[in-house]
Amino acid sequence: MVVFSKTAALVLGLSSAVSAAPAPTRKGFTINQIARPANKTRTINLPGMYARSLAKFGGTVPQSVKEAASKGSAVTTPQNNDEEYLTPVTVGKSTLHLDFDTGSADLWVFSDELPSSEQTGHDLYTPSSSATKLSGYTWDISYGDGSSASGDVYRDTVTVGGVTTNKQAVEAASKISSEFVQNTANDGLLGLAFSSINTVQPKAQTTFFDTVKSQLDSPLFAVQLKHDAPGVYDFGYIDDSKYTGSITYTDADSSQGYWGFSTDGYSIGDGSSSSSGFSAIADTGTTLILLDDEIVSAYYEQVSGASGETEAGGYVFSCSTNPPDFTVVIGDYKAVVPGKYINYAPISTGSSTCFGGIQSNSGLGLSILGDVFLKSQYVVFNSEGPKLGFAAQA
């Protein structure tokens, strides 16, 4: 475990603007998420979202969650301050709004190869105007809630913030399920996990980050997601104004293609810390925190009126409840998730019952620390090592 001071972060994170070497020019840049309300009222199938997160990592989706997802038992309309936050990316000649996902390694997008009925409301990638097709290459992704997407693969120019590559594999959707079509705010996904889990066949392709990291000041990116506000991604440098104290580093386990790491314990509310650590993945593409049953049960024992209601597909409680904080111990650092973040959303529009931001990992064997966790932290994803760094947001 290494603690990294702000002074060191400033020295190592200098951008090309202050570099004395004229060539080759390297860069560091920041790109902001933006709010993307859909053209029509957006709904979220909460158990469907939960099922998709479990299946993404090869987990078993409980039958009760499958049934709740298929029945739409917990479909909610977010309030205005719960809009979807996405990131603008130029792909070929199109500007698309993508979900940045540290838990996957594909860059796939809505394209004009989709049937016209599935294009409505989305910004589209038009490969014929700029791309070279990778003949014989395809991709196909499916999730635990029944959603799926597939299509052909192209080589094209992709620009994120201040960095451009003309050698990026872009996966253009030609088939896509209704779950994706209905979310007209989102035009696709940009994976930031390790390239080893890219799904393109017959040969996996590199992620955008792996393609461009040699252009960056440092081969890293840092994430500052926010609660009820757009977040920020810093590529190539660490912004010391975005965190307090010091950054605590721990080794990242990339053996499964994810940003995995080991924690050193946890605590609930004002309770003492448990020394029982657990293996986890830092995933911007998962909304919830998914933990071992023992930890989940211990947490909801401290939430008045909470129940593992099978009809809703997960733990629920009264929306008026103030759940306790949840703390993850990483070395000497304690990453605190405020309880209000765990009061995630009403199980249906206007309901007084809320779906919990902490749910079971269904025996997955590792925990997923998704956005509910990440929105309290400034997290550094460094490919050298690799390693992960954590600090409280400023």
From Swiss-Prot:
GO terms for molecular function: aspartic-type endopeptidase activity. Its main location: secreted. It is found in: Secreted. The keyword Protease applies. Residues 1-20 form the signal peptide. GO terms for cellular component: extracellular region. It catalyses: Hydrolysis of proteins with broad specificity. Generally favors hydrophobic residues in P1 and P1', but also accepts Lys in P1, which leads to activation of trypsinogen. Does not clot milk. It holds the Pfam family Asp. The active site is at D101, D283. Residues 21-69 form a propeptide. InterPro entries: Aspartic_peptidase_A1 (IPR001461), Aspartic_peptidase_AS (IPR001969), Aspergillopepsin-like_cat_dom (IPR034163), PEPTIDASE_A1 (IPR033121), Peptidase_aspartic_dom_sf (IPR021109). Disulfide bonds join C319-C354. Gene3D superfamilies: Acid Proteases. Keywords: Aspartyl protease, Disulfide bond, Hydrolase, Protease, Secreted, Signal, Zymogen. Its EC number is 3.4.23.18. GO terms for biological process: proteolysis. It is an enzyme of class 3 (hydrolase). Residues 85-391 form the Peptidase A1 domain. Belongs to the peptidase A1 family. Secreted aspartic endopeptidase that allows assimilation of proteinaceous substrates. The scissile peptide bond is attacked by a nucleophilic water molecule activated by two aspartic residues in the active site. Shows a broad primary substrate specificity. Favors hydrophobic residues at the P1 and P1' positions, but also accepts a lysine residue in the P1 position, leading to the activation of trypsinogen and chymotrypsinogen A. PANTHER family: ASPERGILLOPEPSIN-1-RELATED (PTHR47966:SF2), BETA-SITE APP-CLEAVING ENZYME, ISOFORM A-RELATED (PTHR47966). This is Aspergillopepsin-1. It comes from Aspergillus awamori.
